Amino acid sequence: QCLVGSEMCIRDRDGRLTVDFEKQGEMAATDIVERIGTGKVAIIQGISGAAQSEGRTNGAKKVFESTEGVEVVSVQPADWDSQKAYNAAADLVKANPDLKAIFCCNDVMALAASEALTDNKAKEGILIYGVDGTEEAKNAIKEGRMDGSITYPSSVYAKAAVVMLMKLSQGMEMDDVVYCPLDVINTDNISEFDGYK
């Protein structure tokens, strides 16, 4: 494939920059377990079969299921849709009044889950985590409406891509896959992420 009006052609890829979706799920679940100790947890997925959704779900399940005293009571898709996530969270707390945490596979669904719990007067005592580290999620963490999120750092992603291109242009060797660094944002460290994108 060649760029229109250019002699530059792409014959093969020299490397791939990505995010470890399973690691995001593991990090969220680990932080949740450290906070709740034991109890019932639930996972609200994105689109079933999508790489981000499956990776984050599998990572979280691995941590939850390997922790004694933690029970995964529900794993259900909400298709990245806020209304579906709202409904799923509302149903979860009605069916499991002793629920300790909900891990949502992105912040949009986590914000909706938080709203559902608040509307059902059930937020107190239930942790809500998402993924992406959006401004809305960070504000919700500051305000106590969410409890954590895992970064999906777009600015770091862009900088890493530029560094990769510079190295390639200088003939330097690249790893086949380069993973972006990730961080847990929670109520303890939220102030450190002001202005983080």
Task: Label every PLM stretch briefly.
Residues 14-15, 40-48:
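Short beta-strand segments enriched in small/hydrophobic residues
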Residues 14, 100, 147:
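Conserved acidic residues
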Residues 60, 73-74, 78-139:
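Hydrophobic alpha-helical
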Residues 1-5, 9-10:
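Single conserved hydrophobic/aromatic residue that forms the stacking wall/gate
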Residues 24-28, 51-70, 84, 88, ...:
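Short, solvent-exposed amphipathic alpha-helices that sit
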Residues 44-48, 52, 63-67, 73, ...:
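Hinge/cleft segment of the Venus flytrap/periplasmic-binding protein
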Residues 144-151:
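Rossmann-fold dehydrogenase core element
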Residues 17-41, 55, 84-86, 134-137, ...:
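Hydrophobic alpha-helical segments within soluble ligand-binding/sensing domains
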